[in-house]
């Protein structure tokens, strides 16, 4: 009977301690790694190009007191406005295809108006890991969809088996000026970067800023919309209730995300001297 060779990693020799220290990964090679596992990284480094990235955006008015609990200083709130978004990303270098949903508050940092990202939900591990590690996107696991149902653009978000958001918009009712669409997508974005240390205190606690600059608008529309948010303790979008729909847009783009820069360090209670805005 023919004998099969031992499976990879199953030989007795592989279980013995290494006799030659030179066979281990050198320290300088460890420093070349950008994430783990080192043999099969959770994501590939950028830049990541998003082709045919499609947005359903609904801006709505909410309760100021509820929003103030979620927006960190030194950011300020002029009006209690929130943008609910569902993004279909069918062709992304390194990440593949996925759909994402989130909420962003309209805020101001000094004289600059932008958005503070409250939370993002998606079901693509590389995009979750890279968003949290390489940048500061507050991503967690969820299942979003963006699709056309007859004459309606529909966006949904499920957390586990439960529906937590449902958005509908009239499909391509009125054209939206491309420059207005560009301004909406390229608004400065602020996020919290928090990395805990081993002794419970944070090792990193920063407010960062990013801004999309490399973008092509391929289509843009506006129209009527409705948004329903459902209570969930671990996906608390409904903590910012919908009081009034302000605007709704449907935008198709190609774009590349810019790296984030630190604008405030909570551990030193200061803005880094070397910080500069990414343009």
Give each language-model segment a name:
Residues 41-86:
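N-terminal ordered "arm"
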Residues 129:
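Phosphate/adenylate-binding glycine loop and adjacent helical scaffold
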Residues 99-112, 116-126:
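Active-site-adjacent structural patch at catalytic or cofactor/ligand-binding sites
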Residues 12-24:
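Short, Lys/Arg-enriched N-terminal segments with co-localized hydrophobic residues
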Residues 77-108:
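Short, structured protein-protein interaction patches enriched in aromatics and acidic/basic residues
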Residues 7-8:
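Acidic, Ala/Val/Gly-enriched low-complexity intrinsically disordered segments
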């Amino acid at each position: 009977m023919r004998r099969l060779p031992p499976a990879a990693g199953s030989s007795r020799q592989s279980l013995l301690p290494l006799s030659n220290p030179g066979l281990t990964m050198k320290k300088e090679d460890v420093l070349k790694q950008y994430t783990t596992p080192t043999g099969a990284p959770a994501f590939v480094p950028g830049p990541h190009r998003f082709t045919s990235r499609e947005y359903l955006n609904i801006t709505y008015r909410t309760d100021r007191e509820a929003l103030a609990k979620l927006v960190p200083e030194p950011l300020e709130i002029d009006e209690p406005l929130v943008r609910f978004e569902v993004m279909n990303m069918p062709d992304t270098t390194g990440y593949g295809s996925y759909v994402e949903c989130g909420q962003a508050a309209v805020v101001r940092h000094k004289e600059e108006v932008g958005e503070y990202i409250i939370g993002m939900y998606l079901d693509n591990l590389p995009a979750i890991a890279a968003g949290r590690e390489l940048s500061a996107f507050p991503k967690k696991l969820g299942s979003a969809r963006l699709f056309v149902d007859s004459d309606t653009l529909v966006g949904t978000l499920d957390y586990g088996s439960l529906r937590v958001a449902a958005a509908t918009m009239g499909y391509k009712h009125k054209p939206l000026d491309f420059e207005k669409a560009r301004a909406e997508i390229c608004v400065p974005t602020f996020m919290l970067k928090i990395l805990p240390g081993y002794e419970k205190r944070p090792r990193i606690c920063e407010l960062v800023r990013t801004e999309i600059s490399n973008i092509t608008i391929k289509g843009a529309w506006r129209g009527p919309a409705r948004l329903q948010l459902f209570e969930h303790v671990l996906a608390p979008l409904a903590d910012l209730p919908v009081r009034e729909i302000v605007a709704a847009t449907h935008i198709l783009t190609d774009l590349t995300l810019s790296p984030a820069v630190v604008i405030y360090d909570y551990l030193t209670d200061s803005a880094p001297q070397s910080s500069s805005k990414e343009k």
